[in-house]
Design a protein with these regions (language model features):
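Active-site and substrate-binding clefts of carbohydrate-active enzymes
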Residues: 1-21, 44, 153-438, 516-525, ...
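Catalytic alpha-helical scaffold of carbohydrate-active enzymes acting on polysaccharides/glycoconjugates
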Residues: 4-114, 122-176, 188-203, 221-224, ...
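Non-catalytic regulatory/linker segments of enzymes
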Residues: 60, 77, 84-87, 91, ...
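C-terminal amphipathic alpha-helical interaction region
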Residues: 389-496
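Terminal end segments
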Residues: 463-553
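Eukaryotic RNA-binding helical-repeat scaffolds
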Residues: 533, 537-624
Length: 624
């Protein structure tokens, strides 16, 4: 499944219309939790909302606006652009991440941020200095990250090197119980715990908690209901009210000085060891995280090499490179006026920053989805560097990550993962050309509906031309041949024709970019379903009563029924067409379907159709 889509459905969207139930379990009202709770949304997640769940992004912004109307200050906190552990970044990279995060916040919420949430609450003095220099007024930390947190939840005053910032420390025990205990099963009990917090002499006590948004609906099913019920109860509580950090700071400026415990985070008690080495933090016991150190060291070496390449190859007429990086932002705004080399180097820097996204080190194994993602950023950064710079940097990277070993011996080390998971992604333009060829041959009109984030596509005779949107000087030209057994190509052979002597590459249709596969599916499904499904199944499909997985299996079952009726030579193409749907969905036929195919094909005499299906399904059929 798509993780963002799942969590959006279970949590982020649910919180935008959180349900308040009456005593009989009937829906009484909905509340937009973003109007009542302080929150932060990472810029990269917000970017995903823009394309896949714009209504959720709109509800989040609306919640912040409603809080501003009610309180005078919005609920939203900014976040550094990438989810990086800022104390492990250079000061220059800290500044860029914070500036990019502030800019994204301003664009979305139409105001300057008062506060900034630090990824994993990872903090040191330099990080807070950068926040203060960039106009941030407060952040939120775990109580163990400062010495002597101020009493009654009041903000503390951090001062260092002439800079000052307010620090809120959340209620650690309550936050822990919300995340890891049963608090969300009893909104009344949650409300009671808040009411029992000791009162200050002046009658003002602040109770704040901090937890992941995924707590409400994913980690705890129906957690959104508990939060909605609490909000409803607090609305009618004469002795407590929902507020936000910025409002508290305005009404109760800090009077207690706090001392920072440097290089700490809320999710690791080992001085940021979780993102450096095998510190003992893990999801499951018994696994080794010795891979963390070589992964970070390899990427640090590469980042140093990228920065050095920028210093060496940056065009003098483009101005100061690091100021230009900050100004261009993650979307490379305004780079059209820059020389091509400057644009390429800025793009390389964007990927160099993304290489340190914290989740790559958080979990248990090198072979999980997260480490290959940061390595793909590394591969793209290398691809953008000048000739002669790229090769030694890549060799040094591989030498270091070769020391990183997966806990599964079959998965190998960092080099094996680079070759298996990363180099495939590095062939992005070729895979895109393969997908465009498939669309051209199946449903050419759909090319008008193909919207790609990074490329513009043109057809010029037999050539497929790809033009990069941000680097218009990056143009590639391809020829492609498709191999069709069903309705869409099983595989595509592509060859770059603007460089002499380039060998053809071969791609299964399952690896072409998702926007292309979605258009191919939209064209293929009606053809396959009309040929294979019965009237009742088609009606269930139209009514949304037949899930995609069930529809694929029903189509495959229907195709085999046609083979039984019309023979393999006549109906084998329909079986291939049904299998095309699995490929386009990047799904594998279940074992039962493979066994059924073996039993259907084994008694039949050898034929090209039989052999092709056996090859596609990895069947070792008897020869006669």
């Amino acid at each position: 499944h798509d993780w963002n889509a799942r969590i959006t459905r279970e949590c982020y969207a649910a919180l935008a219309k959180a349900r308040v139930l009456d005593a009989q379990g009937r829906l009484r009202r909905t509340v937009n939790a973003y109007e009542w709770c302080s929150f932060d949304v990472g810029p990269t997640l917000f970017h995903w909302f823009d394309h896949h769940a714009p209504e959720v992004g709109a509800a989040i912004v609306a919640g912040d606006h409603a809080a501003r109307v009610r309180l005078g200050y919005g609920n939203a906190l900014a976040q550094p652009y990438h989810h990086v552990i800022l104390p492990l970044a250079s000061r220059r990279d800290k500044i860029t991440e914070v500036r990019w995060g502030i800019r994204d916040f301003q664009r979305r919420f139409g105001r300057d941020p008062e506060g900034m949430w630090l990824p994993e609450t990872a903090v040191d003095h330099e990080t807070l200095e950068v926040l203060a220099e960039e106009g941030i007024r407060f952040t939120v930390l775990s109580p163990h990250q400062v010495t002597s947190p101020p009493p009654h939840g009041r903000p503390g005053r951090w001062q260092h090197a002439g800079r000052e910032l307010a620090i809120f420390c959340y209620d650690g025990p309550l936050a822990h119980d919300i995340a890891f205990s049963n608090v969300l099963r009893d909104a009344r009990g949650w409300h009671r715990r808040i009411a029992e917090v000791p009162m200050a002499d002046d009658g003002v006590t602040i109770c704040s908690v901090a937890t992941d948004g995924e707590t409400f609906g994913h980690h705890h099913r129906h957690g959104d209901l508990a939060l909605a019920s609490l909000i409803d109860r607090l609305e009618h509580d004469s002795e407590a009210r929902c507020t936000n950090f910025a409002t508290i700071l305005a009404d109760h400026p800090p009077i207690h000085d706090v001392t920072l415990v440097e290089r700490t985070a809320w999710s690791c008690p080992h001085s940021l060891g979780r993102w450096l080495h095998d510190c003992g933090c893990r999801m499951n016991g018994g696994s080794s995280q010795a891979w963390r150190a070589p992964l970070r060291n390899g990427l640090l070496q590469l980042a140093d090499g990228i920065h050095a390449a920028v210093e060496t190859h940056w065009p003098a007429e483009a101005g100061e490179p690091w100021a230009c990086r900050d100004a261009a932002g993650p979307l490379l705004d305004g780079v059209e006026a820059l020389p091509g080399m400057a644009t390429r180097l800025l793009e390389a820097e964007r990927h160099a920053l993304a290489m340190f996204t914290s989740c790559a080190w958080f979990f248990d194994d090198l072979e999980r989805i997260e480490p290959p993602i940061v390595l793909r950023h590394a591969a793209r950064a290398l691809e953008l560097l000048p000739e002669g710079v790229r090769e030694p940097l890549e060799s040094a990277l591989l030498e270091t990550i070769g020391q990183a070993q997966s806990n599964d011996p079959a998965k190998g080390n960092g080099i094996a993962i680079w070759q298996r998971e990363v180099l495939r992604e590095a062939s992005g333009p070729a895979r895109l050309a393969a997908g465009v060829a498939a669309l051209r041959d199946l449903t050419p009109d759909a090319l008008d509906d193909l919207v790609l984030p990074a490329h513009v596509v043109r057809l010029e005779g037999d050539d497929i031309v790809l033009v990069h949107r941000r680097r218009i000087d990056e143009v590639t030209r391809w020829r492609a041949e498709t191999v069709v057994a069903g309705v869409v190509p099983m595989r595509v052979h592509v060859r770059r024709v603007d460089i002499a002597g380039q060998a053809a590459e071969h791609f299964a249709i399952s690896v072409v970019p998702r926007p292309v596969r979605e258009l191919l599916l939209a064209a293929a499904r009606p053809m396959v379903f009309d040929a294979t499904l019965g009237d009742a199944q088609r009606e269930a499909l139209r009514d949304g009563l037949l899930a995609p997985e069930a529809a694929r299996m029903a189509a495959l079952d229907g195709a085999w029924l046609l083979v039984g009726r019309d023979g393999l030579d006549e109906a084998g193409v329909v079986v291939h067409a049904a299998l095309d749907l699995f490929d386009l969905d990047q799904a594998t036929p279940p074992d039962a379907a493979v066994v059924a195919a073996f039993e259907a094909l084994a008694p039949l005499p050898p034929s090209p159709t039989r052999d092709a299906l056996a090859s596609r399904l990895a069947l070792a059929l008897p020869e006669s």
